[in-house]
Amino acid sequence: MIPVLLVTICLAVFPFQGSSIILESGNINDYEIVYPKKVNVLPTGAMNSAHPCCDPVTCQPKQGEHCISGPCCRNCKFLNSGTICKRARGDNLHDYCTGISSDCPRNPYKGKYDPMKWPAAAKGSVLM
């Protein structure tokens, strides 16, 4: 029997449980949750209701889906490249989704050299 570590997001339905659990894979239909000196059996279908993007057994995105959560993930898909995921503040510029990740990478540019706002400024010039 190989224990499988499940990530908390798939089990958000069960707030009384710890930050992670181990699923004993002897009989996967029983969904046995193994704790030290204690075994609980979840009701049938309980794992399936946790998150619409998440495979209830592997806690990975379901087949055909890109992501489970994150600032650049909506309805189980990555947001388009160039979508603002963090608004500008002070001297910092907007941060944009890449279209290939659910993370929101930090924009390395400052001021008028933001390549999403001023693409002409970045063409053929050296940015310092």
UniProtKB/Swiss-Prot annotation:
GO terms for molecular function: toxin activity. Residues 21-47, 115-128 form a propeptide. It is found in: Secreted. Pfam families: Disintegrin (PF00200). Disulfide bonds join 53-76, 67-73, 72-97, 85-104. InterPro entries: Disintegrin_CS, Disintegrin_dom, Disintegrin_dom_sf. The keyword Plastid does not apply. Keywords: Cell adhesion impairing toxin, Disulfide bond, Hemostasis impairing toxin, Platelet aggregation inhibiting toxin, Secreted, Signal, Toxin. PROSITE patterns: DISINTEGRIN_1, DISINTEGRIN_2. A motif (Cell attachment site) lies at residues 89-91. Residues 1-20 form the signal peptide. The keyword Disulfide bond applies. Expressed by the venom gland. Residues 26-112 form the Disintegrin domain. Gene3D superfamilies: Disintegrin domain. GO terms for cellular component: extracellular region. Negative results: does not inhibit alpha-1/beta-1 (ITGA1/ITGB1), alpha-2/beta-1 (ITGA2/ITGB1) and alpha-6/beta-1 (ITGA6/ITGB1) integrins. Poor inhibitor of platelet aggregation. The disintegrin inhibits the adhesion of cells expressing the RGD-dependent integrin alpha-5/beta-1 (ITGA5/ITGB1) to immobilized fibronectin. Inhibition on alpha-2b/beta-3 (ITGA2B/ITGB3) is low. Heterodimer with EO5B; disulfide-linked. Belongs to the disintegrin family. Dimeric disintegrin subfamily. This is Disintegrin EO4A. It comes from Echis ocellatus (Ocellated saw-scaled viper).
